[in-house]
């Protein structure tokens, strides 16, 4: 938008912390506002003005005291930021005489003063900024328009611009902040004078609010405009994310909350900005706070954003086409719930936008309802009234309500109606599967708590950080015994399991290191055993009060086989994975979702434990970790999972025709008959070293007790 201002207000801010290119990066508060007005018509400047601001925490850095000359005592009697902003606006309106129709725009040295200082602090303190703070001129960009071949924009500063325009200001006559403002004024006067005759017509814009919208999977998203935010409170919405990045322009529909495999928020979000410049400013807010939590900010890619926010469903696009609507997610609906029942659930205090058209039920590809739905509300007030019905009853079920986003709608619909967001490893073809990769059972002692669990690690923590954290106990870690746990997006989950040389050292490490700090976060440390690691990775909880089994595990599955193996050396564990147990050793972890019938007879599937888990994905071992494939020391007895062999084998099937015969009491008889192993509940598959030895027991079709057996060569 083209403007023609009558006045420019050269504004300079000072915080209690860093200055220059680091201004605002440390989240410090404003302590000083200095400005000077320039009449663009007469090319004359007014007086230099100053307002001191009282921060909530008066603690000036040495850099601030040295440059500004301020002291803690000088800030004690002054007004806070909200009053200072109001005074600044009133004094500007009076000096410019806006009542007579005159207009003015702010002008700053770069983007930081407005985008990284004023707007973030005003947002965190719930201060409503005047309209003049949402449009401003960047003096560096205005200079670059006239001299495009000069220094790169990121290398520009006031001194470079002043030298090029032959502008000199006597620094001895002014304090530092007043000197900077005077320098800006002289640069502006030089730009608008001959021979340059520059016009200030295209100001920078600061978005007043975040706009929701949809994103197509076919859309092109620049990698240099996307960031990933971690550590978000689980109840945060896209509006909360926009508030955290206040001052920076987020693209329409550019805040996408990430969900885990169960459809719940995992504390991460992908944010798309309008330009690379705003993305770079967002990265400077790394470890800034949202409430009491600090948020980590990292670079991401356009592909990452499209995986989360992109959609192709026309139904979803139509539902989300109503802009500026508040979305509420319903979870736990009865499967036979109708739109009319949902409308009655919310009426009359919170009417749904467009009636039944404002309700979107989530369904499986075959049309079955999932129990989820999304509902539109026209304003924040209606949405808040709706959220008050959280856990109210609809039929015989209580309904969970959450504030949602357009990106979450896309993710949930993508999850249920199309391919999963996280690809599942293919079904096993055992003829090409490598031998088991776990450490032999002789390395693990059942029930011994010789492992340590770390919880609450910083997401960027490395193995070296963990060794430093454990201190003297780092020497007691087994070789390649540090195992980082990843979430379903392949990102660090903040947990790790460590194999110690003895239970005593694991106990001492847990006692001495519990709740020590690592990178500003305290870390919880618990001693545990390999069996307890199984439970935790399957969704159970482990703390100093004891172990709680996961709700997804059936009671008979709590019993672990004798000598359960420990973690593979150097393995990287996905959250939700299950450590291999004796009779399930050859199965990939995603195959342990439940018992399955024997597949095609050309492959061999031994009986498996009834193991249940929510979801898991594969992750490679970290670089440098030795491979343990085919590692079986001399004298090791193969487990049930090690039946795969490079030697040729033959199989026979034993099918009992006498219902009274039960194999749970007949294992020894079968072993004595065929010298085999691994019986099942009704059928048994037995492997032999050669075809000849497999044919011998077929001649005898009975076993002790008189039961007739059908022996077949496979």
Curated annotation (Swiss-Prot):
It comes from the Eukaryota. One of its GO terms (cellular component) is nucleoplasm. The keyword Nucleus applies. Residues 225-302, 326-406, 450-530 form the RRM domain. It is found in: Nucleus. Signal peptide: none annotated. Keywords: mRNA processing, mRNA splicing, Nucleus, Repeat, RNA-binding. GO terms for molecular function: mRNA binding. GO terms for biological process: cranial skeletal system development; hard palate morphogenesis; mRNA processing; regulation of RNA splicing; RNA splicing. InterPro entries: ESRP, ESRP1_RRM1, Exonuclease_RNaseT/DNA_pol3, Nucleotide-bd_a/b_plait_sf, RBD_domain_sf, RNaseH-like_sf, RNaseH_sf, RRM_dom. The keyword GTP-binding does not apply. Belongs to the ESRP family. mRNA splicing factor that regulates the formation of epithelial cell-specific isoforms. Specifically regulates the expression of FGFR2-IIIb, an epithelial cell-specific isoform of fgfr2. Acts by directly binding specific sequences in mRNAs. Binds the GU-rich sequence motifs in the ISE/ISS-3, a cis-element regulatory region present in the mRNA of fgfr2. This is Epithelial splicing regulatory protein 1. It comes from Danio rerio. The lineage of its organism: Eukaryota, Metazoa, Chordata, Craniata, Vertebrata.
